[in-house]
Regions:
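Helix-to-beta-strand junctions that scaffold the AdoMet/dcAdoMet cofactor pocket
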Residues: 265-266
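Adenosine-nucleotide cofactor-binding segment
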Residues: 184-190, 202-260
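N-terminal Rossmann-fold NAD(P) dinucleotide-binding loop
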Residues: 194-195
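NAD(P)H dinucleotide-binding glycine-rich loop of Rossmann-like/cofactor-binding domains
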Residues: 35, 108-188
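C-terminal hydrophobic helical "lid"/dimerization subdomain
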Residues: 11, 16-19, 213, 259, ...
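Glycine-rich beta-strand-centered segment in the early N-terminal region that forms part
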Residues: 37-53, 66-113, 152-155
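Glycine-centered, small-residue-biased loops immediately flanking beta-strands
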Residues: 269
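Rossmann-fold NAD(P)-binding glycine/threonine-rich loop
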Residues: 276-290, 303-307
Length: 352
């Protein structure tokens, strides 16, 4: 373990941990070997030795500073799996050596109305793993212990990382919208998010329709649990599905003909967007007359993440992944950026 002993003016000793990582030094730059130091562990924090970390499209956006708040040098990575190696003095629910997962959020205030109502993911004072701090393309990472979630025994350590961002992103709408096993749900986009959404909804007991412009996705969508497949390469493909779905979950990062999807909703149905479309233009009257709604969500709160992990544990749900050593991180990022990932990419720690 690399560390530096620092002598304070108070004549007290403390350990400054040296972290090995991969970082970009400018927007869109290649990731290079990078070292930084961690100070003292806060009482409510844990330190995690990273074993696996997923690559998410949000990492790519942050890498290029698409959202305008990336700080360089930038260490991506927020789908983290590893073992707890240090525990703050106020942490009582985690143990050394325990496998945990860490996603987008690293800290919340615990005292605002959102936190007190269980929506810690909405905390306006919260901190995110890769916003203003270094992420999981590293051998170590720290977070508030609240956001380090123990892995159930049947959850695969190698493939679990994407559950903590992509997984909870598509699981949260099922909880939010009170989806029942008797509901019929459509999933738009059969990619990194969509394939997990289909698996969750199938195990939930729903009738599931997969929607894609790529007819080659039909067989895999059925393997994931879809009951039906709609190829929207044909502009009129949705017309026979008027008033069909209780929820349409949009996982694709594209702008759609929103009115045509709203028509597929049953009265009281919801168009729920988790893909990063640029805007939604839709006629208002069908929403009013059918009491339909449009909404979206990011990740979920701690309670919902724990529910998701328990659900995965009981139903044997895991993302479909491709594994790269972290030393090949730039090749892995290029693979995702080219749209070749099937369906999530996970980096394996091979730091020397």
């Amino acid at each position: 373990m690399d560390y530096i002993i620092t002598y304070l003016y108070t004549h007290e000793l403390y350990i400054v941990m040296k972290v090995q990582a991969f970082a970009a030094h400018q927007p869109g730059g290649k990731l290079e070997n990078f070292e930084y130091e961690l100070g003292s562990l806060k009482p409510d924090e844990v330190e995690i030795d990273v074993e696996y970390c997923g690559i998410c499209h949000s990492d790519l956006h942050m890498l290029k500073n698409d959202w305008g708040f990336t700080r360089y040098p930038f260490v991506p990575g927020h789908e983290i799996i590893g073992k707890v190696t240090d525990i703050g003095s106020a942490v009582t629910h985690l143990q050394l050596g325990q496998y945990v997962g860490l996603g987008w959020r690293a800290r919340s205030c615990l005292v605002c109305d959102q936190c007190l109502s269980g929506h810690h993911n909405r905390c306006l004072k919260g901190q995110d793993v890769i916003v203003g701090r270094h992420g999981g393309y590293a051998n170590k990472v720290r977070c508030q212990a609240l956001w380090a979630f123990p892995l159930p025994k049947n959850v695969n350590v190698k493939s679990a990382g994407p559950l903590f961002c992509g997984g909870i992103t598509v699981f949260n709408p099922i909880i939010q919208n009170n989806i029942k096993s008797t509901d019929h749900v459509a999933v738009v986009g059969i990619g990194g998010l969509g394939h997990m959404a289909i698996k969750f909804l199938d195990s939930w007991g729903c009738e599931v329709t997969a929607i894609s412009t790529n007819p080659e996705k039909e067989r895999e969508a059925q393997e994931f649990g879809a009951d039906h497949f709609i190829n929207t390469k044909n502009a009129d493909a949705l017309k026979p599905y008027s008033n069909r779905f209780d929820m349409v979950m949009v996982t694709a990062n594209v702008d759609l003909n929103w009115d045509s999807y709203i028509k597929t909703l049953r009265p009281g149905g919801r168009l729920h967007i988790v893909g990063a479309a640029s805007e939604v233009n839709a006629a208002i009257f069908p929403l009013i007359s059918g009491e339909k709604s449009i909404g979206g969500s990011p990740i979920g709160g701690p309670a919902d993440i724990l529910k998701m992990l328990d659900f995965c544990n009981r139903h044997g749900i895991e993302p479909v992944i491709e594994e790269f050593p972290i030393s090949d991180v730039n090749e892995a990022i290029a693979h995702l950026a080219a749209g070749k990932a099937r369906y999530r990419i996970v980096l394996r720690n091979d730091f020397k």
